[in-house]
Amino acid sequence: MPLDPVPGLLSRATELLEAEFSALPSLAPAADTDRMASVLEAVAHRLGDNYPYFHPLYAGQMLKPPHPLARAAYALAMKINPNNHARDGGRASSEMEIEAVRELAGMFGWSEYLGHLTSSGTLANLEALWVAGQAAGTRPGMRILASEQAHYTHHRISAVLKLPFSQVPADHRGRMRMDRLEAELKKGDVAAVVCTLGTTAIGAVDPLPQILALRERYGFRVHVDAAYGGYLKLIPDALDEPARSAYAVVAHADSIVIDPHKHGLQPYGCGCVLFRDTAEGRFYKHDSPYTYFTSKQLPPHPNEPKSLAGGPVHLGEISLECSRAGAAAVALWATQQLLPLSPSGEFARGLAQGRAAALELDRRLRADARVQPLVAGHPELDIVVWKLQAESPDQSSQRARAIFDSCAAHDLHLALVQLPESWFAPADTGQNQVENTLVTCLRSVLMKPEHEAWLDRIWERYMAACAAPIGE
């Protein structure tokens, strides 16, 4: 592993933070640091039982290492351990959250909005669908619709919220089919449609412009789940159509979810939910016998939304979560200070590098006669999937699993995914493909900026790993 800069970054910053509280009586230092060191060494050994998620040779799941500054800022904040539920628990970190969320909203083109961080994308999506249900009011049986390729959490969330849920079939590109969506909308019982910008399986981008056009005709909420793909809004020139057009109109959605702990270089868990209509804060209205006492005493922060009473807001007043780590807000704020969300900045260049790596890997795979690529074309974002040529879906799945294991033996870590066989080019054998037949495929998420520079080495290891299983 490379030398970790975090201890050095923390040393001076910790001194400065402690100086902020120097007027307080001193406390005795923690005792028995030898025993703590021993336990921490045991922790280090236990953590060695992990895949090397931080390394570019890990190209499997959606795992991107936090920026060193994010780790340092998070650790520094833990000296205070703020709780961003209320300002009583985190004054500075609440303000930093408001500022960081403002930057995220601005990336999507919103200057007026309601939003906050969450402990996960799941919680962020839950809040968005909860508001959709609340907005539907007393109309019983109003459904949530999402593509069959949307994250499974939407189905589970809808069940928790007791909202009927229906899946809309996807096309061979993994995008929601508009003809099937309109057939559901004609039934007149749809509260909201979930539009995914970057599906988990293949990074597909649902056709948001067409969904918005249907909203004008049928009247429903549009929730954009951009938990994975949201940050790629910064690199439109690196995207192809129709994905570019989908990102261009995201500001017209009713709500958006994005996960800074995916592409945003943040530690888990850091999600974010945004609402275009600030009046939807009314659905959150509640009081607490324990907190919110300081609202009227605090001066307003220049960038924060106002509470329902007109004073400075406690973030818990516009959130379903109660206790929530203020350190996550501190880490995100610090990262965005260093790497602003600018299309011409260093952060955006890193996103473009991952996208370029995915396109190059896809190009090489399409030139390999042993591979069946997606019929519909190249990756929309930075996720590559491919099927292995074989006489049957079962044999193809077995080969994929064998290569997956062989790659791991070569210190290259990929992922597996089950996809409809019909999404892939027909094999040379002329086999008949059944629409509902699933086949296990290889999958690579190339979300690290370093993946572009490491692609030759990734390819060399992949080819070496392929030699034994495919040659059998």
Stretches with model-predicted labels:
Residues 68, 157-160, 322-326, 428-438:
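Short glycine/proline-enriched loop/turn "hinge" motifs that connect secondary-structure elements
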Residues 89-93, 115-122, 145-148, 196, ...:
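Active-site nucleophile and cofactor-binding loops and adjacent substrate-binding regions
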